[in-house]
């Protein structure tokens, strides 16, 4: 009888622990990553990062405690009221920079080879951009608050072409452009 009570108590404790852990993990995953918001003070784009650990810590106690961990306007405006958090609460997925970029790449093709970019692999071979000066860039080279301007002026580039163009730019003496030479046939006449 006592063993059954201990077993039931252990199951209840584990269930509550699982619910609290689940709530914390959900909040952490929901609020991690760099986001693009319109600064209420300047009406300009600003890159912000929510303190996802704090959000995860406060989620199990029933309050969604959001605060900024970083902002592109800091340290000058570090004491702002953080009113931009309202934009994140109302549309957490829409302001995530990764999602903005994913939507922009949808249906686009590489400016060099014409290959459809398809689903983006953000961990391995992510696509790049070509600037108006015909220089390819990776996303980590562009400040997040500049994304709206960059998306209007740059063209999509697949990973393979980005690597080839970077090699061509960095090592021009080692690059041989064979596209202008006629192809030789390997078939015997």
Over which residues does each language-model region extend?
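Short functional micro-motifs and their immediate structural scaffolds
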Residues: 44-47, 76, 89, 115-118, ...
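Short cysteine-rich clusters marking metal-coordination/redox-active sites
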Residues: 39, 68-71, 110-113, 158-161
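Short cysteine/histidine-rich metal-coordination sites, predominantly Zn2+-binding motifs
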Residues: 52-63, 86-93, 98-103, 125-139, ...
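Short Cys/His-rich "knuckle" micro-motifs
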Residues: 47-51, 120-124, 166-172
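Acidic, Ser/Thr-rich low-complexity segments on the non-lumenal side of membrane proteins
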Residues: 38-79
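Feature marks short, highly hydrophobic, charge-poor N-terminal signal-anchor/signal peptide-like helices
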Residues: 1-10
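Short metal-coordination and nucleic-acid-contact micro-motifs, chiefly zinc-binding Cys/His arrays
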Residues: 32-35, 67, 103-109, 151-154
